[in-house]
Design a protein with these regions (language model features):
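Walker A/P-loop NTP-binding motif of AAA+ ATPase domains
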Residues: 1-179, 183, 195
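C-terminal engagement/docking regions of AAA+ P-loop ATPases
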Residues: 3-11, 16, 28-29, 121, ...
């Protein structure tokens, strides 16, 4: 709604930082944003940009932003953005010493460009590793914490990934939801795959139909532990409060 945005002086572009534990769907969230505003989605990894050849990384950044600005509105998404914008006092690479200022210059004022509004979305599991300059106003003005899935999200994830599997009706679904507290979305997917593969092998060995039982999930929980430690969650909380991490 560009007319309403202009009326209320709402910027069409700008910078958004998605941060939080790994495996929580930050990339999918960025894609959903692009789909919601019907904008081209440019996604690159730091490996696509960085180069050991002098000047190549800078050229790659320039090409990326030029390509995005050819559109009426575009979304650029870079995962593991801390690899592109690390704290300069923590790296000695001459490439990064040149690249970080260039990235900061590209991000400067993107929320004010009404000719070619650009939405830059960066995702990271380590927001405290970002250069302090990128966290100042005018770059990543919006910081969105993407947490571990809550009870409702875990219920939806489990229902989606178990719906076509031969799960014994006796398995207590709420028990599964409760047992996966502290699991990331990726952890839950890994758990289901591990349990399903185990029962598949059993069905092949016994040459008959098998059901995924509660004991199979118990065995899965024994080997598929939550990947995010409580100490990591506390670091995100400190970052959100603006405290030193």
């Amino acid at each position: 709604h560009p007319e309403q945005a202009a009326r209320f002086r709402v910027s069409l572009g700008g910078g958004i930082l998605l941060y939080g534990p790994p495996g929580t769907g930050k990339t999918m969230l960025a894609r959903a944003v692009a789909g919601e505003i019907d904008a081209p989605f440019f996604t690159v990894s730091p490996a696509d940009i960085l180069s050991r050849w002098v000047g190549d990384a800078e050229k790659n950044i320039d090409k990326l932003f030029r390509a995005a600005r050819k559109h009426r509105l575009a979304v650029i998404f870079i995962d593991e953005i801390e690899a592109m914008l690390p704290r300069r006092d923590a790296v000695e690479s001459p490439v990064m010493q040149r690249l970080v200022p260039q990235m900061l210059a590209e991000l400067e004022g993107i929320d004010k460009d009404r000719q070619h509004p650009l939405l830059f979305v960066g995702a990271t599991n380590k927001p405290w590793a970002l250069d302090e300059a990128v966290l100042r106003p005018g770059r990543f003005d919006d910081r969105v914490y993407v947490p571990l899935p809550d009870e409702a999200a875990r219920r939806a994830l489990l229902a989606m990934h178990l719906q076509k599997l031969p799960v014994d009706p006796a398995v207590d679904f709420q028990w599964l939801v409760d047992r996966t507290a502290g699991y990331s979305g990726a952890d839950i997917v890994g758990l289901v795959r591990t349990v399903s593969a185990s029962v598949f092998r059993r069905a092949i060995q016994r040459d008959d139909e098998q059901w995924i039982e509660a004991s199979d999930f118990e065995a899965g929980f024994a080997v598929c532990l939550p990947s995010v430690l409580p100490a990591s969650l506390e670091k995100y909380a400190r970052f959100a409060r603006g405290e030193e991490v």
